[in-house]
């Protein structure tokens, strides 16, 4: 199976489209297109060898904050300082995810209080899956 960190690929698609521009208006259709194009490319390239795509999704209120209260605290400050409307972006990401679950053949996995990385690590440990982070194999 091909395990994909949904939020990471979605954000990578966004930042690839906006580059270094500021005061960017979010384009939901472009973001959807870029994400699905990325998934289509990887599915076409790797499905024969590794199997089907599984989208692993982040959830709110992750368990790590119970142990590390400042987990990802710097990201909030960065988002507050950013021109990007992060609340609108997360709504778009959630809406596209719901569309994918309803209309596309991809499996979507979301676990309460877990991030995509937790899901990916668990599936790799349980199924002996080789993990390719995009830059290196683990």
Across the structure, where does each feature detected by a protein language model lie?
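Noncatalytic, basic helical substrate-engagement surface that gates or grips nucleic-acid strands
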Residues: 1-135
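Long, positively charged binding patches that form subdomain-scale interaction surfaces
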Residues: 138
């Amino acid at each position: 199976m091909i395990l994909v960190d949904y939020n990471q690929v979605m954000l990578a698609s966004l930042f690839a489209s906006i580059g270094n521009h500021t005061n960017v208006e979010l384009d939901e259709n472009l973001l959807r297109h870029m994400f699905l194009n990325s998934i289509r490319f990887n599915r076409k390239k790797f499905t024969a060898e590794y199997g089907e795509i599984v989208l692993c999704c982040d959830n709110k209120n992750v368990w790590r904050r119970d142990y590390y209260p400042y987990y990802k605290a710097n990201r909030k400050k960065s988002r507050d300082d950013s021109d990007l409307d992060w609340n609108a972006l997360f709504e778009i990401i959630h809406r596209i995810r719901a569309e994918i679950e309803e209309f596309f053949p991809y499996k979507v996995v979301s676990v309460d209080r877990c991030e995509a990385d937790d899901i990916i690590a668990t599936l790799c440990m349980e199924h002996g899956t080789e993990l390719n982070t995009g830059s290196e194999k683990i």
